[in-house]
From Swiss-Prot:
Chlorophyll a 2 binds at residue 102. The gene is CABE. This is Chlorophyll a-b binding protein E, chloroplastic. Keywords: Acetylation, Chlorophyll, Chloroplast, Chromophore, Magnesium, Membrane, Metal-binding, Phosphoprotein, Photosynthesis, Photosystem I, Photosystem II, Plastid, Thylakoid, Transit peptide, Transmembrane, Transmembrane helix. Its main location: plastid. Chlorophyll b 1 binds at residue 58. It is found in: Plastid, Chloroplast thylakoid membrane.
């Protein structure tokens, strides 16, 4: 019997399921055993400016030649790797996963740092809206209440908060690391299925562009979080308060003026 191949759509975005019986799987009584394997996503159109050898580079037309191992296959590849961190395929795969995960945490974190302060400036009452001061409210006399509502979530116990963090984050990380808790074909970075209820990944070309947008915004968010940490250490204020101070007096409230405060003898 001639071998046949059938492609079926998978519930996970960017994946296809290949049913490919080999000659050894076809028995004499005509019974066929199907084997499920993960197929690669459809290649991105050569017209995309973010992929392939002609993609946008880190210095535009002055970038020079990219390393041979940076082929433009993955989102966010601008052909720059002076430290050679991507030369080893296994190391590159690990670093790529870590970057995407940290990008997502940074985007959530940056929003979480700015949004409460924004609400507080518009009349919403918080015990403490500045992100690096909020946690210490649990030691205050009134304790810590979510959104100012003492009955919403009981947050007076540090041990209870710690336990919730361990259980909730541990469950998510366990799901991600295990990869296939339900025996399904899963991409740990872009699982699709239930994680894509809006169907944003149904069009391969649109999905490829969304990956680029995610990694670009994630990298900006990581730099933002670094800036928030530095601001907290130097000024002791939240990001929006620092922005307001800078707009009110840009000459005396900027990175250079704060940096010169640490010059010996000043």
């Amino acid at each position: 019997m001639a071998a046949s191949t059938t492609a079926l759509s998978s519930p996970f975005a960017g994946k296809a399921v290949k049913l490919s019986p080999s000659s050894s799987e076809v028995t004499g009584n005509g019974k066929v055993t199907m084997r499920k394997t993960a197929n690669k996503a459809k290649p991105v159109s050569s017209g995309s400016p973010w992929y392939g050898p002609d993609r946008v580079k880190y210095l535009g037309p002055f970038s020079g030649e990219s390393p041979s191992y940076l082929t433009g296959e993955f989102p966010g590849d601008y052909g720059w790797d002076t430290a050679g961190l991507s030369a080893d395929p296994e190391t590159f795969a690990k670093n790529r996963e870590l970057e995407v995960i940290h990008c997502r945490w940074a985007m959530l974190g940056a929003l979480g740092c700015v949004f409460p302060e924004l609400l507080a400036r518009n009349g919403v009452k918080f015990g403490e809206a500045v992100w690096f001061k909020a946690g210490s409210q649990i030691f205050s006399e009134g304790g810590l209440d979510y959104l100012g509502n003492p009955s919403l979530v009981h947050a007076q116990s540090i041990l209870a908060i710690w336990a919730c963090q361990v259980v909730l984050m541990g469950a998510v990380e366990g799901y991600r690391v295990a990869g296939e808790p339900l025996g399904e074909v899963v991409d740990p970075l872009y699982p699709g299925g239930s994680f894509d209820p809006l169907g944003l990944a149904e069009d391969p070309e649109a999905f490829a562009e969304l990956k680029v947008k995610e990694i670009k915004n994630g990298r900006l968010a990581m730099f933002s979080m670094f800036g928030f940490f530095v601001q907290a250490l130097v000024t002791g204020k939240g990001p929006l308060e620092n922005l307001a101070d800078h707009l009110a007096d840009p000459v005396n409230n900027n990175a250079w003026s704060y940096a010169t405060n640490f010059v010996p003898g000043k």
